[in-house]
Amino acid sequence: MAALFNRIIPILFVNDLAAERDFYLRLGFHVTYEGPEYPDFTALGHGTVEFGIERKAGFISDRPDQVLAWQFGVKDIEEARQRLKEAGVPFTEQLMSPSKDWQYRLLHARTPNGYHLLLEEGSD
């Protein structure tokens, strides 16, 4: 039986659509949809990753990190680090060691609307 579900496209609610859009563009994402039909919505993509950001009337969460930890796997953690630096995004780095034979690095940052962004070093 073929899989019924073939992709997931999360939508993040934000107060400042322009700042959030610019943040992801500076990291190398591109706009996959913007239009007059949905003026408070922008879809962004990079490779096989796609998600939306939407200005939501009444969005009042001052702690969106309590709602969502936004984690992306990246093929090149050094390039991800460089993009954050070039974009002027403050970040921290963490070395994870779940076991003796398994280590990887995480970069932690905040989006303009307060989401916790994690970039995880990984393999294909």
Q: Where are these predicted regions, by residue range?
A:
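Short amphipathic alpha-helices within nucleic acid-binding modules
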Residues: 23, 78-83
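Conserved short beta-strand elements that form part of the metal-binding/catalytic scaffold
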Residues: 31-65, 116-122
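Short beta-strand micro-motifs in enzyme catalytic cores
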Residues: 40-42, 68-70, 103-107
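N-terminal beta-strand motif that seeds the catalytic metal site of vicinal oxygen chelate
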Residues: 1-19, 68-70, 120-124
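Vicinal oxygen chelate
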Residues: 1, 34, 81, 85-124
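Core segments of cupin and vicinal oxygen chelate
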Residues: 4, 11-50
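A generic structural micro-feature
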Residues: 2-4, 62-66, 101
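Helix N-cap motif at beta-to-alpha junctions
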Residues: 16-17, 74-78
